[in-house]
Amino acid sequence: MKLRYLNILKEKLGREPTFVELQAFSVMWSEHCGYSHTKKYIRRLPKTGFEGNAGVVNLDDYYSVAFKIESHNHPSAIEPYNGAATGVGGIIRDVLAMGARPTAIFDSLHMSRIIDGIIEGIADYGNSIGVPTVGGELRISSLYAHNPLVNVLAAGVVRNDMLVDSKASRPGQVIVIFGGATGRDGIHGASFASEDLTGDKATKLSIQVGDPFAEKMLIEAFLEMVEEGLVEGAQDLGAGGVLSATSELVAKGNLGAIVHLDRVPLREPDMEPWEILISESQERMAVVTSPQKASRILEIARKHLLFGDVVAEVIEEPVYRVMYRNDLVMEVPVQLLANAPEEDIVEYTPGKIPEFKRVEFEEVNAREVFEQYDHMVGTDTVVPPGFGAAVMRIKRDGGYSLVTHSRADLALQDTYWGTLIAVLESVRKTLSVGAEPLAITNCVNYGDPDVDPVGLSAMMTALKNACEFSGVPVASGNASLYNTYQGKPIPPTLVVGMLGKVNPQKVAKPKPSKVFAVGWNDFELEREKELWRAIRKLSEEGAFILSSSQLLTRTHVETFREYGLKIEVKLPEVRPAHQMVLVFSERTPVVDVPVKEIGTLSR
């Protein structure tokens, strides 16, 4: 904990904090949990949807999509397999906690080389729980040598009448924790994720260990509880464990809680109370319910071979009281726990758009990664990995699109414009599959905001301005700061996850045709919406469209080959730094933007 934060805590408590309180506040006031540097910026963003563990956006009168992106950067740097695997598990539970069945996973990976453990961790976890990994992006650069970025997006479909809130609503409710048993893994994981990676700061206890088969049981058990009307509120046990989940549930409802740590199911019997409180053991959920429903919840948990118990009561007094075998362990105001100190923000005024140079990341065939993922489990994947946005079908009717996108190569040259272009190019990719953009989730990956607060301000200002320009609001998000090694930061990397609404039956597939480059060589903000109108028009006419920041990659070539097609194009001598839009059509597109024939797609 920062010394300034410690002094604030002493002042608020009116005394010296106890050992247990220091452990608790070091977690809850960490950057990972408390968002001290970004909370004021986040309040400025245009928002949409039902907020909770994940953002929820309506597709129609019957269905909504819950979706969110999160980072597991620090754990994946230390222990690639478990770090990446538990990143998948955690974001799946965030979506699940809204009452949604998880239906899709996307990843955005930035590293200096393909780290097999990270790929295997994502693949093994996603494949084992039966949720398809339908796409993502892979960027290889030495700029991420010591700080790989592992950002994972999950989405799920929920009936509008089955949405679950993320708070307690009245005194007298109880909180049930169920899932895997609690051990010492992941203790102070949230604090570790808020630090520079230099030196020997990470220990085995900082890295969570996942069990995808327990996660699968957890998914089915929780959805059964929701279907029976037993769940009145829910929270994933992620960063901060029991402490974070139970305190957030009551803080959001302006209530309090009495937590009994001796009721938490353990797999290590000699754990200290503070260890039980902040352990980040995986595959656990907290459910708010009525006392009379608790026994049925525990019955369902046992049926699915999961542990569980009633661990807390919701009270009217706004305090967070922790007990262990009838001894008082901690008692503090619940809102003090939930509201970390906030750092002042820096106002940023953008300059003119620069003349970007192409910063080539190492080209890789991402199909070598995609092929480790099961993208067809569930049989709802309409557009598979390889071309950008994925399209998912909803069994009743309709569908949604997802895409992840980043432009660290541009943000490295100008943080503001590189970040803004990443959002606007995500709109291009979404429109390219015939979808209408609905909302975004985002992950702000940044270095040290104490050293360079201006860069963070540039990122957050660009995100706000891009959302306002495009009319696509934010539904959820995540910030991962202190991605530094020996004081050297990563490039400012905003990863955008964009959700769109689409009719899967009208999604174009590649077929033999001419290839056209559509749009301008230079990025011009005032003309961007003209390009969007052109993409929308051509998509409605049935053209297959590919938007790519590298024009044509090995991944695209190999993906066309999967369709039995061969692409031949003449690349321009000077390729633009921004994303190009390729239109595949038998005749020259008729649109109000520049069009140039550059090749063919043939059998």
From Swiss-Prot:
Pathway where it operates: Purine metabolism; IMP biosynthesis via de novo pathway; 5-amino-1-(5-phospho-D-ribosyl)imidazole from N(2)-formyl-N(1)-(5-phospho-D-ribosyl)glycinamide: step 1/2
Sites where the protein binds Mg(2+) 2: 94, 236
Binding site for ATP 2: 107, 136-139, 388, 429, 549, 556
Protein EC: 6.3.5.3
Residues annotated as catalytic: 32, 72
Binding-site residues for ATP 1, renumbered to this chain: 35, 68, 442, 477
Keywords, alphabetical: ATP-binding, Cytoplasm, Ligase, Magnesium, Metal-binding, Nucleotide-binding, Purine biosynthesis
GO cellular component annotations of the record: cytoplasm
Residue numbers binding Mg(2+) 1: 70, 478
Subcellular location: Cytoplasm
Effect of residue 32 to A: Loss of FGAM synthase activity
Reported effect, residue 32 to Q: Loss of FGAM synthase activity
GO molecular function, one term: magnesium ion binding
Annotated substrate binding sites: 71-74, 93, 189, 208, 280-282, 480
Annotated InterPro entries: PRibForGlyAmidine_synth_PurL (IPR010074), PurL_C (IPR031652), PurL_C_sf (IPR038411), PurL_linker (IPR041609), PurM-like_C_dom (IPR010918), PurM-like_C_sf (IPR036676), PurM-like_N (IPR016188), PurM-like_N_sf (IPR036921)
Effect of mutating residue 72 to A: Strong decrease of the binding affinity and 20-fold decrease of the catalytic efficiency for FGAR. It has no effect on the ATP binding site, however it affects binding of FGAR
Catalysed reaction, written as an equation: N(2)-formyl-N(1)-(5-phospho-beta-D-ribosyl)glycinamide + L-glutamine + ATP + H2O = 2-formamido-N(1)-(5-O-phospho-beta-D-ribosyl)acetamidine + L-glutamate + ADP + phosphate + H(+)
Single GO BP term: purine nucleotide biosynthetic process
Function: Part of the phosphoribosylformylglycinamidine synthase complex involved in the purines biosynthetic pathway. Catalyzes the ATP-dependent conversion of formylglycinamide ribonucleotide (FGAR) and glutamine to yield formylglycinamidine ribonucleotide (FGAM) and glutamate. The FGAM synthase complex is composed of three subunits. PurQ produces an ammonia molecule by converting glutamine to glutamate. PurL transfers the ammonia molecule to FGAR to form FGAM in an ATP-dependent manner.
Note: Purl possesses an auxiliary ATP Binding region which is not catalytic, but able to bind additional ATP. The conformational changes associated with its binding could have a regulatory role in formation of the PurLSQ complex.
Family: Belongs to the FGAMS family.
Subunit structure: Monomer. Part of the FGAM synthase complex composed of 1 PurL, 1 PurQ and 2 PurS subunits.
Protein name: Phosphoribosylformylglycinamidine synthase subunit PurL
Lineage: Bacteria, Thermotogati, Thermotogota, Thermotogae, Thermotogales
Gene: purL
